[in-house]
Amino acid sequence: MSVGALETAPSFESRRRVVGAKLGRYQVGPRIGVGGSAAVYLARTTGPMSSEEFVAIKVVHEHLSEEEEFISQFRDEANLLVRVAHPNIVRVKELGRENDTLFLAMEYLHGQPLSKLASTLARRGAHLDSVLVAWLGARVAEGLAYAHELTDDQSEPLALVHRDVSPQNVFVTYQGEVKLIDFGIARAAGRIVQTTLGRVKGKF
């Protein structure tokens, strides 16, 4: 999986086929997660000028694609998140739209969320070493510090806040990287979270 805690939700593919489709320069593969506002798919870049690369594609559910307020906030937040470039935060590559399908292309992470690693160890009667936990926490703190200090082109703070820094949103890759995931969720618990200009709020 490549993005945070994705809860089970009804499939939206009955009316719109996504698997096998081409969204922009991406060929969409299998679905790897689904949440309340979007589903996530494994995809790869295509085209003669593109080096083949696997990415995670977050596709907004069809019923939300028709909500003007949601789409406006989604675009604003995506455009801010594209600016974020830090080794301890998942990289958002681009926001795109193909016909009526709105999507976000992100770095694909091959690994497991920290919550799953901890639960796997617990089932085996083990636990994460305290030194390792401290190291993981330091990497998360570095990512958060960068996000909190990020500014726009006028050097004004963007006030990017995660608000759900939890084990399911800390991803550890098989290469030993530590990545914060699931920034910028604007819709939660069936409501629109109001944001002010230049401010992104995470999950509540």
Predicted feature residues:
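Conserved short submotifs of the Hanks-type protein kinase catalytic core
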Residues: N99-P113, L117
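Protein kinase catalytic-loop region centered on the HRD/HxD motif
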Residues: E142-L160
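Activation segment signature within eukaryotic-like protein kinase domains
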Residues: L136-G137
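Activation-segment/catalytic-loop signature of the eukaryotic protein kinase fold
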Residues: L95
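AlphaC helix of the protein kinase catalytic domain
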Residues: L114-L128
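Protein kinase glycine-rich loop
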Residues: V28-G35, V40
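AlphaC helix of the eukaryotic protein kinase fold
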Residues: H61-R83
